[in-house]
């Protein structure tokens, strides 16, 4: 009876906290909640169908083991593993894992996955570009495999099962969330006061799904370089592959005229860094003044064309990489363009080592985005495993392909500007891109952010979203920042941190201040390892926007 009363009391306290103003909630670092159950009592715990917002056959805890953190010997947690069972008996289970700290800060963080998922993300690390280990900070940390199991994250064959595909698209997120709430409530006697999500790439797409589709349930979200323009990015992979390989015919002409060998690609990148590195005030191998560099791209392109004897076909490949493409028709979300990358400003084009296209395309040998696009078109969009990616006209699709593209955009894209539920829930979003990301275009993510501003206005967007773009950052790599602490301050106090926020740059090991868009990091003098030696400049060449973005 005493245990029951204690659990009820703690649940009532949690409810009071949830309805209190944000200013009344202690920070994570000031909160410690202890379990009300023994860890082993979780084993065999059934999660009823009624606990899930989406249709399932319930869930179950399979194992629960007390574990000591590998990075902090004073931190102990319960490593919980479980299943969420599908309605379709031929569909895979959702496998999830949850870390429950013995000293809990009252918050949870759900970590997103990568590529086509198929495995549970690592829960004991810092996550995408993170600077903090969440379990060591007292967070409940959890994640799932997106609703199927695969040896390779590139495997898209699971999509032949409708429930598995629906789970991957978005449903696994809220199902895992519901499992977390149920298990957490059982173990601590209450749900989290604040529920966070953090992810990059596919995990970034998942982050935006949480903010838009499930915005009423999440309090703070970190979204890193999201694969949110899902159909457009996979079409970019198809169009880039065509630019590289369209001349290839194994019998008549076994050459890919658009292919650029790896040595030349690396030399172009080195030339760009050498030319633009000092524009930010310091030569440190990081191109920070991306705007001035991009405004010079026509001159730079002329230089490298002459230096390396680039052909018309090779220039087309570079054009697709740098500028993306524009369609005469729009996706279901209204977008008709993919804006390309910083390929001529120090980014690394990845065309693979081999000019011979495999079938299916293989990223070990071929264009990096080719195999990802190939799998998505085969299993997600066309449902045709014999689809040959480079054999179709994406600029002028026939009616059948057009209809499939529209249906796919409606289902898979995660670039909705509808944050009404998230805003009403007082949700907070940190949105992040890297100038050197060659997987998810920073220029495309800028366009997406502008869509938010167009819908809500800058002042309203600023109240729930901070958008940073940083130099020297590739795809979910190259930087470490304490975004969990920033989100916690924002959600707990109602105010975003007012002090200058710094991140650690992998390229130098030093710090730089976070550059809120459209700012860029400028060196002012002093110790280059000290973030205080930099400022955030908003100096942008006249006429830049609408021409070079």
Tell where the protein language model's regions lie, with residue ranges.
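Alpha/beta-hydrolase fold nucleophile elbow
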Residues: 190-201
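Cap/lid segment of the alpha/beta-hydrolase catalytic domain
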Residues: 105, 114-189, 235, 387-402, ...
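Short beta-strand/loop motif that positions the catalytic acidic residue
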Residues: 430-433
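Glycine-rich nucleophile elbow surrounding the catalytic serine of serine-hydrolase chemistry
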Residues: 199-209
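Catalytic-loop region of hydrolases
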Residues: 23-105, 120-129, 276-279, 287, ...
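A catalytic-pocket lid/entrance helix-loop region that shapes and gates access to the active site
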Residues: 209-211, 216-326, 469
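Sec-dependent N-terminal signal peptides of Gram-positive bacterial secreted proteins and lipoproteins
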Residues: 4-22
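Histidine-bearing beta->alpha loop at or near hydrolase active sites
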Residues: 464-477, 506-507
């Amino acid at each position: 009876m005493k245990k029951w009363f204690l659990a009820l009391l703690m649940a009532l306290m949690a409810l009071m906290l949830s309805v209190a103003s944000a200013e009344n909630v202690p920070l994570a670092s000031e909160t410690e909640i202890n379990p009300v159950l023994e860890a082993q009592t979780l084993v065999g715990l059934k999660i009823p169908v009624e606990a899930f917002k989406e249709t399932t056959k319930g869930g179950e805890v399979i194992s629960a083991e007390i574990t000591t953190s590998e990075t902090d010997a004073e931190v102990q947690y319960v490593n919980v593993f479980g299943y969420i069972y599908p309605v379709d008996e031929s569909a895979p289970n959702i496998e999830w894992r949850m870390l429950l700290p013995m000293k809990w800060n009252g918050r949870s963080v759900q970590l997103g996955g990568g590529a086509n998922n198929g495995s549970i993300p690592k829960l004991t690390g810092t996550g995408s570009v993170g600077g903090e280990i969440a379990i060591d900070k007292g967070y409940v940390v959890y994640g799932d495999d997106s609703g199927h199991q695969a040896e390779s994250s590139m495997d898209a064959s699971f999509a032949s099962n409708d429930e598995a595909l629906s789970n991957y698209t978005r449903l696994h997120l809220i199902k895992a969330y519901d499992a977390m709430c149920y298990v957490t409530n059982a173990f601590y006697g209450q749900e989290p006061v604040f529920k966070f999500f953090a992810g990059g790439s596919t995990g970034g797409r998942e982050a935006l799904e949480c903010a838009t589709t499930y915005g009423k349930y999440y309090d703070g979200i970190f979204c890193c370089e999201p694969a949110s323009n899902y159909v457009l990015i996979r079409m970019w992979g198809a169009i880039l592959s065509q630019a590289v390989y369209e001349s290839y015919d194994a019998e008549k002409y076994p050459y890919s005229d658009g292919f650029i060998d790896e040595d030349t690609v690396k030399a172009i990148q080195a030339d760009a860094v050498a030319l633009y590195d000092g524009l930010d005030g310091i030569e440190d191998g990081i191109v920070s003044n991306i705007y001035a560099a991009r405004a010079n791209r026509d001159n730079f392109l002329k230089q490298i064309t002459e230096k390396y004897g680039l052909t018309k076909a090779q220039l087309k490949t570079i054009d697709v990489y740098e500028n993306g493409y524009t369609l005469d028709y729009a996706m279901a979300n209204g977008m008709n363009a993919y804006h390309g990358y910083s390929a001529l400003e120090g980014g690394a084009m990845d065309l693979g080592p081999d000019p011979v296209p495999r079938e299916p395309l293989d990223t070990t040998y071929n264009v990096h985005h080719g195999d990802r696009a190939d799998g998505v078109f085969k299993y997600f969009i066309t449902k045709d495993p014999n689809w040959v990616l480079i054999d179709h006209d994406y600029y002028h699709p026939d009616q059948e392909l057009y209809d499939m593209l529209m249906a796919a955009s409606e289902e898979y894209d995660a670039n909705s500007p509808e944050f009404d539920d998230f805003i009403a829930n007082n949700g907070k979003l940190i949105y992040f891109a890297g100038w050197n990301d060659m997987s998810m275009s920073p220029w495309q993510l800028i366009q997406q952010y502008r869509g938010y501003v167009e819908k809500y206005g800058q002042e309203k967007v600023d109240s729930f979203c901070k958008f940073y773009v940083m130099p020297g950052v590739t795809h979910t790599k190259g930087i470490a920042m304490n975004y969990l602490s920033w989100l916690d301050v924002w959600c707990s106090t109602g105010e975003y941190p007012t002090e200058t926020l710094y991140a650690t740059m992998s390229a130098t090991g030093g710090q730089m201040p976070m550059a809120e868009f459209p700012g860029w990091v400028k060196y002012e003098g002093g110790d280059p390892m000290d973030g205080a030696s930099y400022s955030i400049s908003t100096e942008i060449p006249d006429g830049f926007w609408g021409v070079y973005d």
